[in-house]
Amino acid sequence: VLTVSDTRTQQTDTSGAFLEEALREAGHEIADRQIVIDDVYQLRAIVSQWIADPEVEVILTTGGTGFSGRDSTPEALAPLFDKTIDGFGEVFRALSHTEIGSSTVQSRALAGLANGTVIFCMPGSTGACRTAWEGVLRDQLDSEHKPCNFVGVLRGH
């Protein structure tokens, strides 16, 4: 779990904490949880290291997907993707529209597959992370979800 923020600390990172707890409750192991500033190269370096680690199968990022001057998660991570998972951003924005209306057009949530690791990039709000988890991620990271899920494409499976 990687929080992208210039202001969050371990104590104030409610989105990262939510994702860590949700993953644990669903039976997943957490290899690492970090906070990185909104910097393309620092973000790319951490995620590249995790992609290269055979123990890391899924990366969830929160933050840096908006339009402020320093939001850079899409620019940092999209070049690392071997394949994009366009449906994640599409479904996330559709779910978000029911909650925040037209403001959802400002979401640049995205996902991709890199070296057998799936990477999901969500906005920084805890509500957005909850929407993504409950509406997409919980099922797609569950090997028993039918008709399909991402477990079969992960490096370790």
Q: Where is each model-derived feature located?
A:
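Non-catalytic beta/alpha edge segments that cap or flank active sites
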Residues: 2-157
